[in-house]
Amino acid sequence: MFLILSGEGAADIGIENDKVGPMTKLIDSWIARRIGYSLIDTNSYTIIPKQQLTDRAKQIKPLSRKGKKQQSETRYFYKNARALALLAHQKRKEIGDNIPLILVLFRDADGTASSDRGEWEDKMRSILTGFEVEQILTGVPMIPNPKSEAWVLCALRNKYQHCAKLEDESGNDRSPNPLKQQLENHLGETGTGILLNDKIDAGEIDIDRIKDMPSLTAFKQRLDEVLAGLSQ
Protein backbone atom coordinates (compact mmCIF):
# COMPACT_ATOMS: atom_id res chain seq x y z
CA MET A 1 0.00 0.00 0.00
CA PHE A 2 1.28 3.46 -0.90
CA LEU A 3 -0.06 6.83 0.25
CA ILE A 4 0.02 9.96 -1.94
CA LEU A 5 -0.86 13.18 -0.15
CA SER A 6 -1.13 16.87 -0.85
CA GLY A 7 -2.09 19.71 1.45
CA GLU A 8 -1.60 23.39 2.05
CA GLY A 9 1.73 23.48 3.86
CA ALA A 10 3.95 22.54 6.78
CA ALA A 11 1.23 22.90 9.42
CA ASP A 12 -1.07 20.27 7.88
CA ILE A 13 0.19 17.60 5.45
CA GLY A 14 3.78 18.80 5.27
CA ILE A 15 5.95 20.08 2.47
CA GLU A 16 8.19 17.12 1.65
CA ASN A 17 8.66 13.48 2.59
CA ASP A 18 11.13 14.04 5.41
CA LYS A 19 9.04 16.86 6.88
CA VAL A 20 5.60 15.35 7.41
CA GLY A 21 2.91 17.50 8.98
CA PRO A 22 0.43 16.67 11.75
CA MET A 23 -2.41 15.76 9.41
CA THR A 24 -0.18 13.19 7.72
CA LYS A 25 0.61 11.71 11.12
CA LEU A 26 -3.10 11.48 11.93
CA ILE A 27 -3.83 9.83 8.57
CA ASP A 28 -1.03 7.33 9.12
CA SER A 29 -2.25 6.59 12.64
CA TRP A 30 -5.77 5.86 11.39
CA ILE A 31 -4.48 3.57 8.65
CA ALA A 32 -1.90 1.81 10.86
CA ARG A 33 -4.50 0.78 13.40
CA ARG A 34 -6.36 -0.99 10.59
CA ILE A 35 -3.57 -2.58 8.55
CA GLY A 36 -1.11 -3.23 11.37
CA TYR A 37 1.82 -1.10 10.27
CA SER A 38 2.79 2.50 9.57
CA LEU A 39 3.12 3.71 6.00
CA ILE A 40 5.40 6.49 7.26
CA ASP A 41 7.71 4.03 9.03
CA THR A 42 7.95 1.90 5.88
CA ASN A 43 8.48 4.97 3.67
CA SER A 44 5.36 4.03 1.71
CA TYR A 45 4.18 7.55 1.03
CA THR A 46 4.96 10.72 -0.85
CA ILE A 47 3.91 14.33 -0.34
CA ILE A 48 3.09 16.45 -3.38
CA PRO A 49 3.80 20.12 -2.56
CA LYS A 50 0.92 22.52 -3.11
CA GLN A 51 2.83 24.50 -5.73
CA GLN A 52 3.50 21.39 -7.80
CA LEU A 53 -0.18 20.50 -7.60
CA THR A 54 -1.20 24.03 -8.56
CA ASP A 55 1.13 24.01 -11.56
CA ARG A 56 -0.30 20.69 -12.74
CA ALA A 57 -3.88 21.90 -12.23
CA LYS A 58 -3.23 24.88 -14.51
CA GLN A 59 -2.43 22.49 -17.35
CA ILE A 60 -5.71 20.60 -17.09
CA LYS A 61 -8.18 21.16 -19.88
CA PRO A 62 -11.86 21.26 -18.90
CA LEU A 63 -13.99 18.29 -19.83
CA SER A 64 -17.34 18.70 -21.50
CA ARG A 65 -19.90 18.72 -18.68
CA LYS A 66 -23.12 19.82 -20.34
CA GLY A 67 -25.70 21.20 -18.00
CA LYS A 68 -23.29 21.34 -15.06
CA LYS A 69 -21.67 24.58 -14.05
CA GLN A 70 -19.38 24.69 -11.05
CA GLN A 71 -18.81 27.64 -8.80
CA SER A 72 -15.23 28.85 -8.96
CA GLU A 73 -14.57 27.66 -5.42
CA THR A 74 -15.68 24.08 -5.94
CA ARG A 75 -13.96 24.03 -9.35
CA TYR A 76 -10.73 24.73 -7.46
CA PHE A 77 -11.23 21.58 -5.37
CA TYR A 78 -12.21 19.56 -8.44
CA LYS A 79 -9.16 20.61 -10.46
CA ASN A 80 -6.81 19.99 -7.54
CA ALA A 81 -8.19 16.46 -7.21
CA ARG A 82 -7.72 15.83 -10.92
CA ALA A 83 -4.17 17.16 -10.72
CA LEU A 84 -3.32 14.90 -7.79
CA ALA A 85 -4.79 11.92 -9.63
CA LEU A 86 -2.71 12.67 -12.72
CA LEU A 87 0.45 12.98 -10.64
CA ALA A 88 -0.44 9.69 -8.94
CA HIS A 89 -0.61 7.97 -12.32
CA GLN A 90 2.93 9.21 -12.98
CA LYS A 91 4.05 7.91 -9.57
CA ARG A 92 2.48 4.57 -10.39
CA LYS A 93 5.21 4.04 -12.99
CA GLU A 94 7.83 4.27 -10.24
CA ILE A 95 6.22 2.05 -7.61
CA GLY A 96 4.68 -0.60 -9.85
CA ASP A 97 1.20 -1.71 -10.82
CA ASN A 98 0.72 -4.23 -8.01
CA ILE A 99 0.88 -1.79 -5.07
CA PRO A 100 -2.48 -0.25 -4.09
CA LEU A 101 -2.55 3.55 -3.99
CA ILE A 102 -4.49 5.76 -1.60
CA LEU A 103 -4.74 9.46 -2.43
CA VAL A 104 -5.56 12.07 0.21
CA LEU A 105 -6.20 15.70 -0.73
CA PHE A 106 -6.27 18.05 2.24
CA ARG A 107 -7.87 21.47 2.04
CA ASP A 108 -9.40 23.55 4.82
CA ALA A 109 -13.05 24.35 4.11
CA ASP A 110 -12.44 27.93 5.30
CA GLY A 111 -16.15 28.65 5.52
CA THR A 112 -17.63 31.52 7.47
CA ALA A 113 -19.80 31.06 10.55
CA SER A 114 -22.86 31.55 8.33
CA SER A 115 -21.83 28.89 5.80
CA ASP A 116 -24.21 25.97 5.61
CA ARG A 117 -23.17 22.33 5.54
CA GLY A 118 -24.09 22.17 1.87
CA GLU A 119 -21.05 24.23 0.92
CA TRP A 120 -18.73 21.79 2.68
CA GLU A 121 -20.52 18.84 1.06
CA ASP A 122 -20.09 20.45 -2.38
CA LYS A 123 -16.34 20.66 -1.81
CA MET A 124 -16.18 17.03 -0.72
CA ARG A 125 -18.18 15.96 -3.76
CA SER A 126 -16.01 18.04 -6.09
CA ILE A 127 -12.85 16.30 -4.89
CA LEU A 128 -14.36 12.84 -5.25
CA THR A 129 -15.57 13.71 -8.75
CA GLY A 130 -12.15 15.02 -9.71
CA PHE A 131 -10.53 11.77 -8.62
CA GLU A 132 -13.09 9.66 -10.44
CA VAL A 133 -12.74 11.62 -13.69
CA GLU A 134 -9.08 10.58 -13.74
CA GLN A 135 -9.90 6.94 -12.93
CA ILE A 136 -8.88 7.07 -9.28
CA LEU A 137 -11.40 5.26 -7.09
CA THR A 138 -9.25 5.23 -3.95
CA GLY A 139 -9.19 8.98 -3.36
CA VAL A 140 -10.07 10.53 -0.01
CA PRO A 141 -11.00 14.17 0.60
CA MET A 142 -9.77 15.57 3.91
CA ILE A 143 -11.63 18.83 4.46
CA PRO A 144 -11.74 20.06 8.06
CA ASN A 145 -14.74 22.27 8.67
CA PRO A 146 -13.99 25.09 8.94
CA LYS A 147 -10.26 24.29 9.34
CA SER A 148 -7.88 21.83 10.98
CA GLU A 149 -7.42 23.99 14.08
CA ALA A 150 -10.96 22.93 15.06
CA TRP A 151 -9.90 19.28 15.15
CA VAL A 152 -6.79 20.10 17.16
CA LEU A 153 -8.72 22.23 19.64
CA CYS A 154 -11.15 19.36 20.14
CA ALA A 155 -8.30 17.20 21.41
CA LEU A 156 -6.17 19.70 23.28
CA ARG A 157 -8.63 22.19 24.77
CA ASN A 158 -11.99 20.43 24.76
CA LYS A 159 -10.53 17.05 25.81
CA TYR A 160 -12.63 15.38 23.09
CA GLN A 161 -15.90 16.65 24.59
CA HIS A 162 -18.64 18.74 22.91
CA CYS A 163 -16.55 19.35 19.78
CA ALA A 164 -19.29 19.59 17.15
CA LYS A 165 -19.83 23.27 17.92
CA LEU A 166 -16.28 24.01 16.78
CA GLU A 167 -17.46 23.32 13.22
CA ASP A 168 -19.82 26.29 13.53
CA GLU A 169 -16.91 28.70 14.03
CA SER A 170 -15.67 30.94 11.22
CA GLY A 171 -12.74 29.75 9.15
CA ASN A 172 -11.74 33.34 8.40
CA ASP A 173 -8.52 34.22 10.21
CA ARG A 174 -9.63 37.88 10.21
CA SER A 175 -12.85 37.15 12.07
CA PRO A 176 -13.18 37.99 15.77
CA ASN A 177 -11.48 35.30 17.90
CA PRO A 178 -10.47 33.07 14.96
CA LEU A 179 -9.69 29.40 15.51
CA LYS A 180 -6.01 29.91 14.79
CA GLN A 181 -5.84 32.51 17.57
CA GLN A 182 -7.85 30.29 19.91
CA LEU A 183 -5.32 27.51 19.39
CA GLU A 184 -2.40 29.86 19.94
CA ASN A 185 -4.01 31.17 23.13
CA HIS A 186 -4.47 27.65 24.43
CA LEU A 187 -0.93 26.56 23.58
CA GLY A 188 0.71 29.79 24.69
CA GLU A 189 2.61 29.80 21.40
CA THR A 190 2.05 29.39 17.67
CA GLY A 191 0.63 26.00 16.73
CA THR A 192 3.38 25.02 14.32
CA GLY A 193 3.52 21.70 12.54
CA ILE A 194 6.53 20.69 14.64
CA LEU A 195 4.73 21.43 17.91
CA LEU A 196 1.59 19.58 16.85
CA ASN A 197 3.66 16.62 15.66
CA ASP A 198 5.22 16.41 19.11
CA LYS A 199 1.79 16.40 20.72
CA ILE A 200 0.60 13.64 18.40
CA ASP A 201 3.69 11.58 19.22
CA ALA A 202 3.02 12.16 22.92
CA GLY A 203 -0.55 10.90 22.54
CA GLU A 204 -2.14 14.27 23.28
CA ILE A 205 -3.92 14.36 19.90
CA ASP A 206 -5.56 11.02 19.11
CA ILE A 207 -7.64 10.84 15.94
CA ASP A 208 -9.55 7.81 17.27
CA ARG A 209 -10.87 9.82 20.21
CA ILE A 210 -12.31 12.69 18.15
CA LYS A 211 -15.84 11.39 17.70
CA ASP A 212 -18.40 14.16 17.21
CA MET A 213 -16.94 16.33 14.45
CA PRO A 214 -18.86 15.64 11.22
CA SER A 215 -16.06 16.68 8.86
CA LEU A 216 -13.54 14.35 10.53
CA THR A 217 -16.09 11.55 10.71
CA ALA A 218 -16.69 11.89 6.96
CA PHE A 219 -12.95 11.63 6.33
CA LYS A 220 -12.64 8.53 8.52
CA GLN A 221 -15.62 6.86 6.86
CA ARG A 222 -14.33 7.47 3.36
CA LEU A 223 -10.83 6.26 4.27
CA ASP A 224 -12.31 3.13 5.84
CA GLU A 225 -14.33 2.52 2.65
CA VAL A 226 -11.15 2.71 0.59
CA LEU A 227 -9.22 0.44 2.96
CA ALA A 228 -12.05 -2.09 2.98
CA GLY A 229 -12.14 -2.11 -0.81
CA LEU A 230 -8.39 -2.68 -1.03
CA SER A 231 -8.50 -5.57 1.44
CA GLN A 232 -11.00 -7.57 -0.62
Regions found by a protein language model. Give the residues of each.
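Short glycine-/polar-rich loops that comprise or flank the Walker A/P-loop
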Residues: 1, 100-101, 134-139
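Well-ordered, non-membrane alpha-helical segments in soluble/globular domains
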Residues: 22-26, 74-90, 114-130
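Ordered, amphipathic secondary-structure segments that act as subunit-interaction surfaces
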Residues: 80-106
